[in-house]
């Protein structure tokens, strides 16, 4: 909570710098789960994949996750002006999404797993598009509750499970948009 309060109090770029420093320390000094991460990257790309490239993917992934955490912590303060300043092209696509929702009663938006996809939900919320998504449960219940509280600042989160499909259909029929990672 203290770290979250600090990251929220700092100016945005300073908070990102602090997140970068924390990620760099974790990756380069502590090497937390680094061996396992590199093993998994090589499993996907093959044993001949250059070690340098695998390290780069691992580093960028951790760095970007740290940046996403900063945005998640600051989600309650994200307003339309912030969205327009940091994601200038976003407003161009809002009318298209709104038209699809009016025409079909709901929408499914596929989002690549790049960057902070939760930010898409917060941004849509600022433009009046009601979003929801599906998430798995985190192992630590305190972390799970915190992450869901942060995410639900801009969109509803459905926990993956047996009744999820019925909830999805109900929300889509009521004019919501589902953000999903294909």
Which stretches of residues belong to each language-model region?
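Membrane-proximal helical "anchor" segments flanking the first transmembrane region
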Residues: 1-108, 115
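Soluble catalytic domains of membrane acyltransferases
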Residues: 76-182
